[in-house]
Amino acid sequence: MNGTELSGKPLGLIGFGRIAQGVAAVAKAMGMQIHTYDPYLPVKIARQQGAFLHKKIDSLFETCTHISIHCNLSDETHHLVNAKRMALMPGKANGIACGNHIVNCARGGIVNEDDLLEALENGNVTSAALDVFEIEPATNGHPLMLHPNFHGTPHIGAATLEAQQRVGTDIAAAVMTTLDGKVAETLVNKEFLSS
């Protein structure tokens, strides 16, 4: 049985915040080509991280055999990863033998799970791993859980002692900053402060 190497393979990161940039650093160390789609990201930040910033999400899917999702769930991102986009992935074309792979540890609902199952069955996607689902908890009878090329975990990606300690420390720091009358660095919806 032969596998394929990650070195030289294109990794597409949907969203390019702190976590995605950390994933990019590890993937780059393994020799992967780093691509991202983030409509809010300045090109300068992508360049500083050695990533190619795609202006259109379809371009990311056309280029990358590996997709990792790192964006928030919103009306804009609901079912962002769907049958149409998974069919664009290049892993079955032009003699590329590595296949196509999707990972979502961000939020359930970004991946259309019915479309993902169909893509796994028709070969557009070779393997997928989700830590988050549109309806949680996902059960053992969930159709994706029954597919041999699917790996699912019950939203436990951050369930380590160290991660939980960091979360507690980050929350305490944000509360203290707010009590000092300042805006916490980790605030994600600053636009609502003025309302």
Positions of the model-derived regions?
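C-terminal helix-to-coil terminal segments
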Residues: N2, A87, E134-S195
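Rossmann-like adenosine-cofactor binding region
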Residues: L41-P143
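Glycine-rich NAD(P)-binding loop of Rossmann-like domains
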Residues: M1-G22
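Aromatic pocket-lining residues of Rossmann-like dinucleotide-binding sites
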Residues: V26-A27
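Hydrophobic "lid"/C-terminal helical patch
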Residues: V23, C64, L120, I171, ...
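Short beta-strand "acidic-cap" motif of Rossmann-like dinucleotide-binding folds
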Residues: I34-T36, A129
